[in-house]
Design a protein with these regions (language model features):
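Short beta-strand/loop element within the Bergerat-fold HATPase_c
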Residues: 97-109
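Conserved short strand/loop->alpha-helix "switch" segment adjacent to the catalytic nucleotide/phosphoryl-transfer site
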Residues: 31, 57-78, 133
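Glycine-rich/acidic phosphate-handling loop/turn and adjacent ATP-lid/helix
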Residues: 111-139
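ATP phosphate-binding glycine-rich loop and adjacent ATP-lid/helix-beta elements
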Residues: 128-156
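Short beta-to-alpha transition helix within the HATPase_c
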Residues: 19-23, 35-53
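Single conserved hydrophobic/aromatic residue that forms the stacking wall/gate
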Residues: 1-13
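Glycine-rich nucleotide-binding loop
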Residues: 122, 161-168
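Conserved ATP-binding N-box helix of the HATPase_c
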Residues: 72-95
């Protein structure tokens, strides 16, 4: 009998968790509908994580999914690292206004563009040591992103503006004759 009560309690806890997770997914499932499952999944996931930490998460999306020049694996690495870095920077910040803004577009000039801006704690200049990726402890992730962008003949740039950090990347949309991307 004691074991049965314990199982019932555990099932109630699990049911509550699943109901909450299902409600979160349902609330956000139609919010992101670019036609690319990787983009939609990452944005939904990080939107929920940001909400859970009282971080504003906003996006402007104008993506033609057939024109994204990154495969799903590459796109996962790029979005995963950039969004994870943004979320981490906001989580460690004590300012009352914290946000992540994502702007993603496949442009008419045949470029896939991702701009991510997030708030962060300003770093005093005398505490910063010269490194390739200023103010970030995520050098390997950004190096993987840079490698993918370079392999696709794109550019990546970041700006530290004290209390905000901006990452801008642009990858040309170049199709080979058989329809696959370079």
């Amino acid at each position: 009998l004691h074991l049965s009560i314990r199982r019932q309690r555990q099932m109630c806890i699990e049911t509550g968790f699943l109901s909450s997770a299902k409600a979160d997914l349902k609330a956000n499932s139609t919010k992101y509908n670019t036609g690319n499952l990787v983009i939609d999944s990452f944005l939904t996931n990080y939107d929920i994580l940001a909400q859970n930490h009282n971080i504003s998460f906003e996006s402007i999306l104008n993506v033609t999914s057939n024109d994204i020049p990154l495969n799903n694996y590459e796109l996962s690495i790029v979005l995963g690292n950039l969004l994870d870095n943004s979320l981490h920077a906001c989580q460690t910040q004590t300012a009352p206004i914290r946000y992540i803004h994502v702007h993603m577009v496949t442009s008419s000039q045949k470029h896939f563009i991702i701009n991510i801006t997030n708030t962060k704690t300003p770093v005093l200049s005398h505490t910063v040591s010269p490194v390739n990726y200023p103010n970030l402890s995520h050098g390997y992730g950004l190096e993987n992103v840079r490698r993918i962008v370079d392999d696709k003949h794109g550019t990546i740039h970041w700006e530290d503006e004290g209390d905000t950090f901006i990452v801008k990347l642009m990858v040309p949309i170049i199709k080979k004759k058989n329809g696959h991307y370079m």
